[in-house]
């Protein structure tokens, strides 16, 4: 399977020096390693054997419509996306998730199966007087100073977390993946991206001409029947 990852120049230097690339702890923003990331790592460990000392994975693109990764677009470059690496990986070596459904994890929202399921969750929030901002605060402690932790709230969060497994699927036109390690002999091409050329590489969350970013959760809701 051919996939693509975007990395920093220092990551490329590490790759060339060592003959492989892993995610060193010092490059991880610990403040952002909340319940969502912990869930991802725990589930990845169940499906992909970790033969390295790495605690955190390397992210990559698996599918974006008819391509592997998003096409370049005019806009501000994602910080740290200096190098585009195309490499081959076995299916047993990669943890694949649906990009849209994963957006629910970042906001700590329930992933519904259909419209009825969605409405049921909305009623649950209303009955328990829980706001979506409170749910997000629970997983984004880097952006919120405090969060709820009462029994009623945590019970709903537990229901939400049980739905997260729905993002572990290849049934989507936009797929992302995580690997523990990239060996140099897996690499097909390495492309140094031009600096300040006015393009966004490897991202779907850039601002559009209207100044807004795509709402992936809203898009998923529209797909429900």
What are these regions (language model features)?
Residues 86-225:
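Active-site and NAD+-binding cores of ADP-ribose-processing enzymes
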Residues 1-22:
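Short, extreme N-terminal segment that most often corresponds to the first beta-strand
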Residues 4-7, 32-36, 127, 152, ...:
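Non-membrane alpha-helical secondary structure
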């Amino acid at each position: 399977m051919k996939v693509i990852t975007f990395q920093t120049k220092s990551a490329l230097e590490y790759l060339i020096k060592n003959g492989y690339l892993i995610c060193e702890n010092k490059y991880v923003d610990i403040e952002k390693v909340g319940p969502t990331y912990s869930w991802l790592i725990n589930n990845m460990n169940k499906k992909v054997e970790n033969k390295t000392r790495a605690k955190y994975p390397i992210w990559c693109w698996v599918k974006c419509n008819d391509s592997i990764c998003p096409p370049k677009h005019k806009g501000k470059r994602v910080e740290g996306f200096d190098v585009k690496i195309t490499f081959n990986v076995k299916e047993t070596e990669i943890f694949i998730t649906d990009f849209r459904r994963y957006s629910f994890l970042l906001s700590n929202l329930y992933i519904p199966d259909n419209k009825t399921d969605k409405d049921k969750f909305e009623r649950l929030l209303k009955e328990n007087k829980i706001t979506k901002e409170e749910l997000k605060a629970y997983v984004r402690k880097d952006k919120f100073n405090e969060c709820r932790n009462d029994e009623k709230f945590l019970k709903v969060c537990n229901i939400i977390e049980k739905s997260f497994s729905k993002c572990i699927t290849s049934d989507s036109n936009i797929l992302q993946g995580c690997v523990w390690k990239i060996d140099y002999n897996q690499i097909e091409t390495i492309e140094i991206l031009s600096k300040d050329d006015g393009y966004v590489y490897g991202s779907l969350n850039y601002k559009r001409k209207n100044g807004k970013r795509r709402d992936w959760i809203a898009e998923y809701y529209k797909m429900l029947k």
